[in-house]
C-alpha cells in the first residue's frame, strides 16, 4: 500500500489528537499555537516531506522550510515553504480552539500573506482542519470565509485523503513539477491583473500623477523641470512606502503615518525627526509633502491601508517590490502643456522595454558565484569583499547577494554561539557594514540608483527586531558613495567635458574617473542591457558611440551593448575575481561577436556556462540566454552545461570540460555531447572545410518585395512576350503587363510549409529582374525594349524611389531608381546551385537546376552554395553531406537557436563545417562517392515524377522509394566516416 508508514504514523497522531480534542477546543484552553505546531502541525508537515528539523543539515540559504520562532511576536507567516531559495507558499498555523473553518480573520490573514508574497496558494491549519486558499486575488473587507478557498480537509479525512493532500502539498510534488502544474491550472488567465505586482504598480502610477499635478500647480519653479519632477515624486513615494514598511515591521507604531496625516502634523519637523533617526537621506527633503494638497495626501495615504488595500510590507518580498519598481521606471511624467502632466514611456523603453530578471535566475547566479567565493570566510573577511553590478536597475542582484551573505552569516554565528539559526543571529552592525562597504551599484538612470539604495535599506531592516537596534544611531548607512549614478561604459576622461552641452552630459552621464580608478571587484554580477546596433544608434549620442568604437575591442560589425558590459566587467575584477552575467547565448557563435570571443579567450577566462538554448526564462519576452561565469584565471578550462529549465539548472553540478585554447574565434563549438565534440574536433583536424568546395552567397535584396515579386496565382493572361496580372490596390483591381524576358522564378516556401532536404523546388512567384550580366538596364533601354515593365515601375515609383532621390527606399550605389536595394546575387543566378533555408528545424539543402532567384535577410530567407570551378565534388555529393545527421548536429551546435528547435545556416558558418574528403584514386572511396551521387540523382528523378502529378498510391510508393535512397546515402556516409577515423585520413 502506498504511504503505508506515513498513514500509520498519521493515524497515531490523529488518535492522540482525538483523545484530548475537547480540551483543545475549549476557548480557555492552555493548549496554545506553539503546542499545536510542535505536537501536530510540524509532524504532519514532516509526513509531507517538509522537515523543519533540517535533518540534511542544509545551510540557511538552502533550507526548504523556514519556520518563525514560536516566541516571535512578529506578524509573519509561521512556515515558509521554499525551493532553490524561492518561497512557494506559506503555511499559517492557529491553535486548535480557533475555528478556522468559519472565522473570517484567519482566512483573511493567510490570503493576505499569500497575495503579498506573490504566491498562488496559501495553507491555513489548526490540525483540526487544513484549508488551501488561492491567493491571486487581493482580499477585500466583505469577503466571506470560504471565498477563494480551494480545498478544506477535516482531520478525520487526513488518512483517507492523504494521497490527495500529498499530491498537492508535498515536497515530492514540488520536485516533480506537479505543484506548479496544478497551481497554474487553477489560476485564472487574468490573474496577473489581480496580482500584487499589477495592483501596486497601477496605484503607484495613479499616485505619481496626483502628486505631480499638485507640484506643477505649486509656486516652486524647480517642479517645472520634468527631470526634477520625476525624481521628486519618486522620492516622495519612497518616503511613504518606507514609513509603511517600518510600521508593518514594528519599528514605528501601527498606522502612525495615517494618524500623522489625519492630525495635519508639522511635516517639516516630522521629516526632520525621521531623517535624524534613520539617516540615509530618505527623509532629507520634505519639499514634496510641503507643496502637496492635503486632500491628495490623504487619498494616497489611506490607499495604503486596509480596507482600501491589503498591503503587508512585512511580507512583501523585496524582489517583488524591485520588479514593480522596474516596471514603474519604464514610464515617466511628461508635460502635455505647461500645467498638464501625463505618463509616457521613457526614451529607452520606447526602443526596448526592460524585462525583470526572474527571481529564480538571480538566486541561481548568486548561489553559483558567492557559494564558491565566500566558503570558509569569517565576517571580517566578508566585509572586505567588493561585489558590484554595472547596470544595477532595481537592485535585484545586490539584494539577493545581500540575502546570501546574511544567510551565510546566520549559519556562521549560530554555529559559533551554539544557538538556533535565525536572521537575528547576525549582529545588526555587521549587516549595516556589509550594505555600506561590500556593495557597489552603478546605473545611468538616477531613479534606478535611488531605487537600489531604497531597496537595500529596506532589506537591511527586514527580519530585524526593534529592541535589537533601538540604541543604534544613525540607524541606516548612507549609500551616496557606493550606489552611484553614472555610465559604467564611459568615464569622464573618455569625453571632452568642455565642449559638451548640458543636455549631452545628462544623456551620457560619464562616470567620475576616480570611481573605477580606486576599486577592483571580487564579484561583478548582473543582467546587462541587450541593445542591438540599430537600437544603440536610435538611443545613444554620437559622442558616446564614438567612445564605444575607440574604447572597446568588442565593438565590431553588428555589435550588441552587452558585449561592452562583458568587456568592461572583466577589466574591473581582481586577479582572482569573478564576473557572472546573464547574456544572450548568440555571442558564442555570431560573426559580430568574433572580437569579443577573441578578447575573452586571449585575455581572460571562463569558469562555466549554463546554456538555456531555446528555453525561455523571461516572462512575456523571447530571449535566448545563458548564464556565463568569467574569470581572470590561469586555468584555461571551463565547464559547459545545457539547462532545459531554471529548476534543472539548480541541479547542475558538473558540465563537459572544454579547453579554451581549442576554441575557434569564428564560432565556439559547445555541446554536452562528448562523442559529438570528439567527432567534430577530429573532422576539423583531418578534413578540409566545405568552403574548399563551395562559396556561400546571399540572395537578392530588392528592398521592395511588394513591388518586385509577383505571385503566379495572380496571372490572368499570358502571351508569347508578356504576362498579365492583376493586383488589388486600395479596393480596386489594377492590371499590369510585364515582359517575360525580365522575369525569373523566385523560390520561397509558402507560410507554414517547412522546407527540408531532397524535396522538389517549386517557384510560386516571379521576380522582376531588370538586369543584364549583373548590371542594371538603363532607363532608355527599358523605355525602348521593356515599356510594360517601366510603366509598372512608374506606377509604383513612390514605393521604390531611393532615399537619395527623395524616396524612402534604402538603395546602395544608386544608378537607376528601379534597381534593387543591394547588388548581391546578380550574376550567380546563371548556374546550378544548392539553395539553403537559413532558418530551419531540419536539414534544408536542395539542388536548383532551374536557376531560380532567392532572397536573404538576417536569420530568414535563403542563401546559395555555389560550386567552385576547381572542386572535384559534385553538387549531389555536397547536398548529401550537408544533409547528413553529423553535419546537421554541427549546424545545430554553432548556429543561433530559436524556439521550435529552429537553428540557422547562414553564410558565416561554412568555414567551420568540415567536408568529408574523398581520395578519388582509392577505389573503395570512389565507389562510395559514386553511389551517393547516383542516389541523389535518383531522388531528383523521383521528385520530377512527383511534380508531374501522381495518384495517391504511386505517390506513397515514390516517397517510400525516396526515403530508401536517403537511408542508403546516410549509411554510406557512416561507413566512410568510420573508414576515415580508422585510417586517420589527412
Residue ranges and their predicted role:
Residues 30, 36-37, 45, 53-55, ...:
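SAM-dependent methyltransferase catalytic region
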Residues 240, 244-288, 388-394, 398-401:
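Extended, well-ordered alpha-helical scaffold/bundle regions in very large, multi-domain proteins
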Residues 95, 102, 121, 563, ...:
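Polybasic, glycine- and aromatic-enriched phosphate-binding surface used to engage nucleic acids
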Amino acid at each position: 500500500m502506498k504511504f503505508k508508514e506515513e498513514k500509520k504514523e498519521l493515524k497515531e497522531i490523529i488518535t492522540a489528537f482525538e483523545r484530548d480534542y475537547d480540551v483543545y477546543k475549549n476557548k480557555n484552553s492552555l493548549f496554545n499555537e506553539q503546542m499545536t505546531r510542535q505536537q501536530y502541525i510540524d509532524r504532519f508537515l514532516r509526513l509531507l516531506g517538509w522537515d523543519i528539523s533540517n535533518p540534511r543539515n542544509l545551510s540557511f540559504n538552502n533550507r526548504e522550510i523556514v519556520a518563525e520562532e514560536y516566541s516571535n511576536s512578529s506578524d509573519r507567516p509561521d512556515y515558509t515553504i521554499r525551493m532553490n531559495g524561492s518561497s512557494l507558499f506559506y503555511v499559517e498555523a492557529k491553535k486548535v480552539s480557533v475555528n478556522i473553518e468559519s472565522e473570517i480573520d484567519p482566512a483573511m490573514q493567510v490570503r493576505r500573506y499569500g497575495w503579498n508574497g506573490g504566491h498562488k496558494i496559501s495553507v491555513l491549519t489548526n490540525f483540526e482542519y487544513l484549508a488551501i486558499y488561492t491567493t491571486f486575488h487581493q482580499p477585500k473587507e466583505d469577503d466571506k470565509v470560504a471565498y477563494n478557498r480551494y480545498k478544506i480537509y477535516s482531520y478525520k479525512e487526513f488518512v483517507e485523503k492523504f494521497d490527495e493532500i500529498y499530491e498537492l502539498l508535498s515536497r515530492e510534488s514540488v520536485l516533480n513539477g506537479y505543484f506548479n502544474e496544478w497551481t497554474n491550472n487553477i489560476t485564472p488567465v487574468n490573474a496577473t491583473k489581480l496580482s500584487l505586482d499589477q495592483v501596486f504598480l497601477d496605484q503607484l502610477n495613479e499616485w505619481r500623477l496626483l502628486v505631480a499635478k499638485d507640484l506643477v500647480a505649486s509656486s516652486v519653479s524647480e517642479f517645472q523641470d520634468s527631470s526634477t519632477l520625476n525624481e521628486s515624486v519618486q522620492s516622495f513615494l519612497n518616503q511613504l512606502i518606507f514609513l509603511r514598511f517600518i510600521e508593518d515591521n514594528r519599528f514605528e507604531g501601527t498606522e502612525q503615518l495615517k494618524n500623522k496625516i489625519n492630525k495635519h502634523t508639522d511635516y517639516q519637523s516630522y521629516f526632520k525627526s525621521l531623517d535624524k533617526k534613520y539617516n540615509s537621506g530618505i527623509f532629507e527633503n520634505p519639499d514634496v509633502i510641503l507643496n502637496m494638497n492635503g486632500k491628495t495626501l490623504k487619498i494616497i495615504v489611506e490607499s495604503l491601508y486596509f480596507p482600501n488595500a491589503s498591503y503587508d510590507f512585512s511580507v512583501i518580498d523585496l524582489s517583488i517590490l524591485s520588479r514593480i519598481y522596474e516596471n514603474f521606471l519604464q514610464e515617466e511624467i511628461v508635460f502635455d502643456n505647461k500645467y498638464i502632466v501625463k505618463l509616457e514611456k521613457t526614451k529607452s523603453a520606447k526602443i526596448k522595454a526592460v524585462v525583470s530578471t526572474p527571481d529564480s535566475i538571480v538566486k541561481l547566479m548568486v548561489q553559483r558565484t558567492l557559494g564558491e567565493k565566500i566558503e570558509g570566510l569569517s565576517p571580517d573577511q566578508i566585509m572586505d569583499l567588493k561585489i558590484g553590478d554595472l547596470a544595477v536597475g532595481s537592485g535585484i542582484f545586490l539584494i539577493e547577494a545581500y540575502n546570501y551573505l546574511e544567510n551565510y552569516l546566520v549559519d556562521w554565528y549560530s554555529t559559533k554561539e551554539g544557538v538556533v539559526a535565525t536572521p537575528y543571529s547576525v549582529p545588526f552592525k555587521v549587516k549595516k557594514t556589509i550594505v555600506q562597504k561590500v556593495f557597489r551599484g552603478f546605473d545611468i538612470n538616477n531613479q534606478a540608483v535611488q531605487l537600489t539604495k531604497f531597496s537595500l535599506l529596506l532589506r537591511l531592516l527586514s527580519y530585524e527586531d526593534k529592541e535589537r537596534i533601538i540604541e543604534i544611531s544613525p540607524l541606516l548607512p548612507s549609500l551616496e558613495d557606493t550606489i552611484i549614478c553614472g555610465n559604467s561604459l564611459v568615464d569622464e576622461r573618455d569625453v571632452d567635458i568642455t565642449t559638451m552641452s548640458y543636455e549631452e552630459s545628462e544623456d551620457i552621464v560619464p562616470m567620475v574617473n576616480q570611481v573605477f580608478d580606486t576599486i577592483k571587484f571580487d564579484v561583478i554580477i548582473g543582467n546587462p542591457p541587450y541593445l542591438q546596433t540599430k537600437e544603440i544608434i536610435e538611443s545613444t549620442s554620437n559622442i558616446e558611440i564614438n567612445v564605444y568604437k575607440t574604447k572597446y575591442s568588442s565593438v565590431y560589425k553588428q555589435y550588441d551593448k552587452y558585449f561592452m558590459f562583458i568587456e568592461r566587467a572583466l577589466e574591473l575584477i581582481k586577479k582572482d575575481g569573478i564576473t557572472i552575467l546573464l547574456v544572450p547565448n548568440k555571442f558564442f557563435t555570431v560573426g559580430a561577436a568574433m572580437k569579443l570571443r577573441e578578447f575573452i579567450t586571449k585575455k581572460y577566462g571562463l569558469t562555466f556556462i549554463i546554456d538555456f538554448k531555446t528555453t525561455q526564462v523571461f516572462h512575456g519576452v523571447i530571449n535566448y540566454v545563458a548564464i556565463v561565469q568569467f574569470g581572470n584565471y590561469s586555468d584555461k578550462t571551463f565547464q559547459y552545461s545545457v539547462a532545459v529549465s531554471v529548476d534543472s539548472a539548480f541541479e547542475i553540478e558538473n558540465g563537459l570540460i572544454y579547453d579554451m585554447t581549442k576554441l575557434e574565434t569564428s564560432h565556439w563549438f559547445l555541446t554536452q555531447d562528448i562523442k559529438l565534440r570528439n567527432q567534430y574536433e577530429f573532422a576539423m583536424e583531418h578534413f578540409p572545410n566545405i568552403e574548399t568546395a563551395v562559396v556561400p552567397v546571399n540572395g537578392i535584396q530588392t528592398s521592395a518585395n511588394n513591388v518586385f515579386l509577383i505571385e503566379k496565382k495572380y496571372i490572368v493572361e499570358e502571351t508569347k512576350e508578356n504576362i498579365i496580372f492583376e493586383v488589388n490596390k486600395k479596393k480596386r483591381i489594377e492590371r499590369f503587363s510585364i515582359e517575360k524576358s525580365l522575369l525569373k522564378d523566385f523560390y520561397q516556401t509558402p507560410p507554414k510549409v517547412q522546407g527540408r532536404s531532397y524535396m522538389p523546388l517549386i517557384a510560386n512567384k516571379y521576380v522582376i529582374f531588370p538586369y543584364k550580366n549583373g548590371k542594371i538596364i538603363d532607363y532608355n533601354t527599358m523605355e525602348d525594349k521593356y515599356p510594360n515593365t517601366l510603366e509598372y515601375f512608374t506606377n509604383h515609383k513612390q514605393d521604390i524611389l531611393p532615399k537619395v532621390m527623395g524616396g524612402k527606399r534604402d538603395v546602395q550605389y544608386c544608378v537607376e531608381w528601379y534597381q534593387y536595394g543591394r547588388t548581391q546575387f546578380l550574376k550567380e543566378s546563371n548556374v546550378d546551385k544548392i539553395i539553403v533555408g537559413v532558418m530551419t528545424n531540419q536539414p534544408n539543402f536542395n539542388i536548383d537546376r532551374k536557376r531560380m532567384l532567392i532572397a536573404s535577410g538576417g536569420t530568414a530567407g535563403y542563401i546559395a552554395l555555389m560550386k567552385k570551378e576547381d572542386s572535384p565534388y559534385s553538387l549531389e555529393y555536397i547536398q548529401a553531406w550537408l544533409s547528413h545527421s553529423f553535419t546537421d548536429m554541427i549546424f545545430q551546435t554553432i548556429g543561433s537557436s530559436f524556439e521550435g528547435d529552429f537553428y540557422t545556416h547562414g553564410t558565416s558558418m561554412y568555414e567551420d563545417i568540415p567536408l568529408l574528403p574523398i581520395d578519388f584514386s582509392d577505389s573503395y572511396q570512389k565507389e562510395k562517392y559514386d553511389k551517393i551521387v547516383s542516389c541523389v540523382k535518383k531522388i531528383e528523378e523521383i521528385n520530377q515524377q512527383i511534380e508531374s502529378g501522381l495518384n495517391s498510391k504511386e505517390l506513397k510508393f515514390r516517397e517510400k522509394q525516396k526515403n530508401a535512397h536517403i537511408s542508403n546515402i546516410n549509411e554510406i556516409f557512416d561507413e566512410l566516416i568510420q573508414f576515415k577515423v580508422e585510417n586517420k585520413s589527412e
